């Protein structure tokens, strides 16, 4: 039997409640999730837990908000997913794709991908559910 399909959820601490809502819906598709405050215990090696989860992840969901763009860990997690060549699902909240595309310092690797808004998440969840089912049947 293969490992469970794992979705790593990257977000800024300010966006924790929104990230938790996304996590609940992702779990509803049958995927497992990694959300730092839910899966890293007090006193645990934070960076080691993140690295381990990113090594196992099948895809990355990154919640992009104006304040998330200022968080170094967001960019580190995106870079790790990019290096592993796993899907990077950019979820926009509080900014538009146009604002992100024109913002200085945003890497082309994000600009080249389709992005969705939080209002488009049901479409993503439906696609994710299909990927999870395909993964289980392998």
PLM region spans:
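Conserved N-terminal substructure of TIR/SEFIR domains
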Residues: 1-63, 82-86, 92-97, 123-138
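Short amphipathic alpha-helical segments
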Residues: 5-7, 111-114
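Short low-complexity, flexible loop/linker segments enriched in glycine and/or proline
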Residues: 48-52, 77-78, 103-107
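Conserved TIR/SEFIR loop-to-helix hotspot centered on a Trp-containing motif
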Residues: 66-86, 98-102
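Glycine-rich, charge-decorated loop segments at or immediately adjacent to ligand/cofactor-binding or catalytic sites
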Residues: 96-111
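Short acidic-hydrophobic, aromatic-tinged amphipathic segments that line or gate anion-handling sites
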Residues: 115-120
């Amino acid at each position: 039997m293969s490992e469970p399909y794992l979705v790593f959820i990257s977000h800024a601490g300010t966006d924790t409640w929104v990230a938790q809502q996304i996590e609940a819906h992702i779990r509803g598709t049958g995927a497992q999730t990694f959300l730092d405050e839910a899966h890293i215990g007090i006193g645990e090696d934070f960076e080691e837990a993140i690295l381990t989860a990113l090594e196992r992840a099948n895809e990355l969901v990154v919640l992009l908000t104006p304040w998330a763009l200022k968080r170094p860990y967001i960019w580190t997690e995106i870079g790790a997913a990019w290096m592993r060549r796993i899907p990077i699902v950019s979820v926009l909240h509080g900014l538009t794709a146009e604002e992100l595309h024109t913002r200085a310092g945003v890497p082309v690797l994000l600009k080249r991908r389709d992005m969705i808004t939080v209002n488009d998440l049901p479409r993503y969840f439906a696609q994710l559910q299909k990927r999870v089912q395909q993964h289980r049947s392998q």
